[in-house]
Amino acid sequence: LLAKAAAINDIAVREAAAAATSGRPLSDMVNAYRMSMVRQGGTFLGQRGMMFGAGPDGGFVLDNNYAEAKILAKGDVVVFDCCGKYELYHCDLARTGIVEKSSARLTALYTVVREALEAAEAKLKPGANTEDLKTIAAEILTHGGLDLKLTTLAWHNVGLDVVEYAHPSDRTKGWVVEPGMVMNFELFHRDPDIGGVHLEDSIHVTTRGLEYLSTLPRDVIVTGKGN
């Protein structure tokens, strides 16, 4: 069921991206996501189902009427942080997009964020400590010139809740990974000039390796291109 939830979330993100074109309000993107989730038999979390933002304000990932009213312009960076559920099991995925054209600045930032995330994921296995994995990512971000004070690095499990911890202290002190866990590493950098750069996936940890629940590519989404 977690895999099914992730699959319908992938489709909903693609439909949201296709609606994020210049001259349209962010509300069109949000509505496309919500309608897609419901049409596929899932539900979206909260009032809107996705945390989102565009342009410099996107670093805050706003979720309110003011943000929804923003009219997108070509070159706006868009955050997709999309959460929902299917038959009680949750999905949580984050991607970064840009409206209709690429950006050298976004590409540079995103390259560092993706490298940091994937380096930490490469060491994800039973017996690993999440704080050690977080340190791996933090070192790459720092080496790439990104300010850690503007960056969220957070491991969490996902299942019957979208953010699960076995013990409250796991949130701040980390935990030892066990086989069968489905985990997300949320990496979200906030750039004052262009906005948010966000990437996150759900991963099933097994003794044989990692199983990624999403099949959505990790490249920056150039929106409005039939993604």
Which residue stretches match the model-derived regions?
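Active-site neighborhoods and metal-handling regions in enzymes and metal-associated proteins
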Residues: L1-N227
